A protein has these predicted regions:
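Intrinsically disordered, low-complexity regions enriched in Ser/Pro/Gly/Gln/His and often acidic
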Residues: 1-2, 109
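Short, Lys/Arg-enriched N-terminal segments with co-localized hydrophobic residues
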Residues: 2-25
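Residue-level recognition of conserved structural "scaffold" positions that shape functional pockets
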Residues: 9-10, 19, 127, 179, ...
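Intrinsically disordered, low-complexity acidic Ser/Thr-rich regulatory segments
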Residues: 17-28, 34-184, 194, 244
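Surface-exposed, flexible loop/turn segments at secondary-structure boundaries
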Residues: 132, 210, 238
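Forkhead-associated
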Residues: 161-234
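Edge beta-strands of extracellular beta-sandwich domains
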Residues: 236-244
């Protein structure tokens, strides 16, 4: 990852982990373009009738997401609601659901790659609007908290699963923790777990009893792999992505 700066703060404060290096949006857009090839082949001319193409919309969405990032209790958090308005001469009224889904997926991928938290599922809407100049896009962003599908789980030795639903999750005993652990040996704000750059990470946030991954402890971020044993003070969990 090229190194991280970690700000450790008390409960209720903002937690910031800033990567020295960030991924370029071009890879995200290229991946999106490849996924869309079959979907929009022979369809793009019917749906996007003007100069605009879905790839341009994907690029705009990633840029708007970047601009929307704010610091929250778990670190950088991006908007998850995006409304795009286009001139009717650029857009067919009947946009295939597959195009919308792929636009939403490029934002999900951007968040996972850059370590952004999303407080709810990503939603993208495309609307025709006569007031928008042909060949341009108007975009509004918003935030709508909601339940996200887990991307991984922390499974306790008892078999109890703690789903990891957000790209950045606070772990601890505090009531507001994304992953609440009731053991008294776990600090109120114990650790931060997140995805970035294609990997999962965890960092101790100045807890009383420390954080270990597969027997290694550190005040710096530690990489999590499928099957990693995560120890938070006296309690242990096994990390497993849902894709496994």
């Amino acid at each position: 990852m090229g190194g991280l700066m970690v700000d450790r703060r008390s409960a209720g404060d903002t937690i910031s982990i800033h990567p020295y290096r960030r991924l370029t949006p071009m890879k995200l857009v290229r991946d999106f373009e490849r996924r869309l090839e079959k979907l929009v082949d022979g369809m793009a001319g019917k749906v996007f009738r003007g100069k605009l193409h879905p790839v341009e919309l994907a690029t705009r969405l990633v840029r708007e997401a970047d601009l929307s990032v704010e610091e929250s209790g778990a670190g950088p958090t991006a908007a998850n609601v995006y409304g795009l308005k286009l001139n009717p001469r650029d857009l067919d009224f009947e946009v295939p659901a597959g195009v919308i889904h792929e636009l939403e997926q490029v934002l999900e991928s951007a968040a996972a790659d850059r370590g952004w938290r999303l407080d709810g599922p990503v939603t993208v809407t495309l609307e025709p609007d006569e007031s928008v100049s042909q060949g341009t896009v108007s975009c509004r962003v918003g935030r709508s908290p909601g339940l996200r599908q887990p991307w991984a789980n922390l499974t306790a030795e008892t078999g109890l699963k703690h789903p990891i639903r957000y790209n950045r999750c606070t772990v601890g005993r505090a009531d507001g923790s994304d992953i609440g652990i009731g053991d008294p040996g776990v600090s109120r704000v114990h650790a931060l777990l997140w995805r970035e750059g294609g990997e999962a990470w965890i960092v101790d946030l100045g807890s009383a009893n420390g954080t270990e991954v597969d027997g290694s402890s550190s005040t710096s971020p530690l990489v999590l792999t499928s099957g990693s044993v995560v120890r938070l003070g006296p309690v242990s969990f096994r990390f497993r992505p849902v894709s496994d």
